[in-house]
Amino acid sequence: MGSGEGVRRGSVPATGERRRGPAPRAAPPLDPELGAALAANGSRAPEPLTPANLADRQRRDAARRPRPTVEELGADGRFEVAELRVPGPPDGPEVTLVSARPAGLAGRPLPLLYYMHGGGLVMGNAWSVLPRILREWVLPLELAVISVEYRLAPRTQYPGPLEDCYAGLVWAAGHAGVLGIDADRIVIGGKSAGAGLAAALALLVRDRGGAGPRPLGQLLLSPMLDDRGSTFSGHRPAGHDVWDPASNETVWKAALGDRYGAADLPPYAAPARATDLSRLPAAYVEVGSAEVLRDEGVAYANAIWQAGGRAELHVWPGACHGFDSLAPRAALTRDARDARTRWLRRLLAPPRA
């Protein structure tokens, strides 16, 4: 990642064997409100994901995760919501996009948030994230959102999910007039694995070039970027976060298959492998000080700066992975939501005459 010597030292050895990470260190303390929320859930952290329990956990997640219908999302009349099936990648299936925008604004093109859900690349869906996005961003900022239903691992491994996201973005930008969006004001974003896909998508769009979309920004919330697990935060003691090192390793193996840990893994599979982070959209990068993915997110923002790019980095003190969902009323959650919204507002503001 980046062009500095520190990145090359952190690459996987030529043998393909994963470099052993640092010894586990003490974890920063959790924010008191977040610690109380974890305790209220009955345990410090959920059972880690393993290859043995992954299929069962996927079934359980699919059964209980919300999947609101188009009618439910638009029931109060404030939003226009549509479910679209668009051409997928070559030799791949169609991609489902869930599109929403504030009602009554059909007369002018709106900026677009093109969003990829979290779930470790193995869980989640495009519908469950929309109520929060509609409430926090679509109405206050008067923007449109498209949430992507990409294929999940291990049934579909790299590059399938990323190519689904790319195909959907190309279609959306090419149909900006029909969708009522401003193709010059597109932000790609996501949370956790979805943020990792957004970072990979920014690299892919840049490198494929041509007449394709040109995102204005990338919103990376606790991004999952590095398959190598070689950072200090990536080896923190278990039991202090809702996302632990064992689960992280399990989902990377599911997503990459035989390419897991390979020395020649493309940066589009794990953006922390990138050696050129120049000419990328402006980035908002957010991590918690007490989460496994902290160090790779901080390093990614730093590498963007080293490449001459724009990045806004927030390390929320005492925050674990997914803290805003764990404790939606916590002061730290309010601060994080305000910071995200301010960044989007600044980035998407129409140019002054």
Which residues make up each language-model segment?
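Catalytic active-site module of serine/aspartate enzymes centered on a nucleophile-bearing elbow/loop
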Residues: 330-353
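Hydrolase active-site cap/lid region
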Residues: 203, 207-263
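Short beta-strand/loop motif that positions the catalytic acidic residue
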Residues: 285-287
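Short beta-strand element of the alpha/beta-hydrolase
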Residues: 109-119
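Alpha/beta-hydrolase active-site loop
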Residues: 156-176, 340
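A glycine/proline-hinged amphipathic helix-loop "lid/cap" segment
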Residues: 1-99, 349-353
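Gly/Ser-rich "nucleophile elbow"/oxyanion-hole loop immediately N-terminal to the catalytic nucleophile
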Residues: 173-188, 208-209
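Short amphipathic alpha-helix adjacent to the substrate-entry channel of hydrolases
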Residues: 127-146
